[in-house]
């Protein structure tokens, strides 16, 4: 390292060569030759797909800064767990009929290797959305089904309802993502024999069924007389227990914690009626739900007992919901917990035999703006540097003479100050309030602060730009470059040896 060749008239200043940026760059280049590239088919005994729902690039950057600041650092230099993975790339997320996508079409692409329409789960693009008849004979095989068919162990975890679009695309075929329980089915769907998503989960009969299923959404499995949504009188949790007599059905974090990973057979955990709590809400209000890290850790312990290996899909489903509600605090704290869960998986597995992929299904219209000084609180108001490059003492004022935050949204419900309320969904109870507000006396770092937005909409929208993908283990290098989202399936299938010869 160090100085250029003898015949050069350039000489490096010692400060340049001893700088941590310079040393760090040299170290990365030097380490590259140790990096394993494994092209061999079937080299990954285990495959774990982590999906941060709505975790676009700006979300990753802001979550990285927040996580670093929570540890007392400036934040910008921090790395989330998955950012240390050796390979990364970009993913094009559009659906076959939609420029900015939804979670049903995107997760179908990742799980089945082909893009499809927005709102459609596990069904080819030739089907019409919400038309049962048009979807028949157009079901797509998923990576989870292939793994089950090979005798591998399988798991699906989500902080959203387990019947929600992302987890559903691992096991269900439905031309309408909203058919989560039979109350949502149209007359046409019933007449043509389409089954609701919860029913498909419980009656999943490939291999010995999905081994570990954890998430929210209990209401879609229970009849109305038991507080559920079903109108057919069926209790699908009872049906699951009958089908898996040695299985364990759990409904609380305490019951889940009591499970013995070394001996438990199959597990169905439905921890909430609808979505599970946001992570900050779960912690602040001591809710009896497992964290995503706890669910991930124990699932790997259970699934790794199978000598044939396993396929596991882990969704942080509520990064997306925080953004839809215009709550950066909630989206980012869920993203930090997602990073913690990925760290747990990295610690419990080896890059020799386990492919871990981390990605998002789509982005959100969430921006990191202004010229804040280094280490400025990411949830705070912009404080810029003065003409000598030193931080000012007060927040900057915009041309309207009011301060402004670093983080904001292009559209959505807009500003609200709900103080210490940790449930971002409380925002939906109040009217939209878009445009500029005087934030001088507002604590923008509080859990209940919802950022300003420009275009008034009942919910903030997804965004259409590419999302990141990060990977470690056999086949990870195949995700470098800018690729279609459907490639994710092909990498998992190749590295995991999931496709028959």
Per-region residue spans from a language model:
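Alpha-helix C-terminal capping segments
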Residues: 111-113, 145-151, 348
